[in-house]
Amino acid sequence: MSGKPNERPFSDIITSIRYWVIHSITIPSLFIAGWLFVSTGLAYDIFGAPRPNEYFTEDRQDAPLITDRFNALEQVKQLSQQ
């Protein structure tokens, strides 16, 4: 017997029908929700990350790197205007 007296062993949990009924619904649902979150662009909007087609512009074809840590805000403004 493992753990505290009132704990069920993990082997009992993963071999139960109830576990698989619940998880056969929740695991695919989480996968689909994550896929929709990224594919609709909502993840980019919420976290402020540039979309894959916004990393490089017509004028700037090199990677937008911040090189001066003390003037980082100015560099970000300059890179976002290009």
Curated annotation (Swiss-Prot):
GO terms for biological process: photosynthetic electron transport chain. Its main location: plastid. Heme binds at residue 23. It is a single-pass membrane protein. InterPro entries: PSII_cyt_b559_asu (IPR006217), PSII_cyt_b559_asu_sf (IPR037025), PSII_cyt_b559_CS (IPR006216), PSII_cyt_b559_N (IPR013081), PSII_cytb559_asu_lum (IPR013082). One of its GO terms (cellular component) is photosystem II reaction center. The chain crosses the membrane at residues 21-35. The keyword Lipid biosynthesis does not apply. It holds the Pfam family Cytochrom_B559a. With its partner (PsbF) binds heme. PSII binds additional chlorophylls, carotenoids and specific lipids. Its cofactor is heme b. Keywords: Chloroplast, Electron transport, Heme, Iron, Membrane, Metal-binding, Photosynthesis, Photosystem II, Plastid, Thylakoid, Transmembrane, Transmembrane helix, Transport. GO terms for molecular function: electron transfer activity; heme binding; iron ion binding. The keyword Thylakoid applies. It comes from the Eukaryota. Heterodimer of an alpha subunit and a beta subunit. PSII is composed of 1 copy each of membrane proteins PsbA, PsbB, PsbC, PsbD, PsbE, PsbF, PsbH, PsbI, PsbJ, PsbK, PsbL, PsbM, PsbT, PsbX, PsbY, PsbZ, Psb30/Ycf12, at least 3 peripheral proteins of the oxygen-evolving complex and a large number of cofactors. It forms dimeric complexes. PANTHER family: CYTOCHROME B559 SUBUNIT BETA-RELATED. Belongs to the PsbE/PsbF family. This is Cytochrome b559 subunit alpha. The gene is psbE.
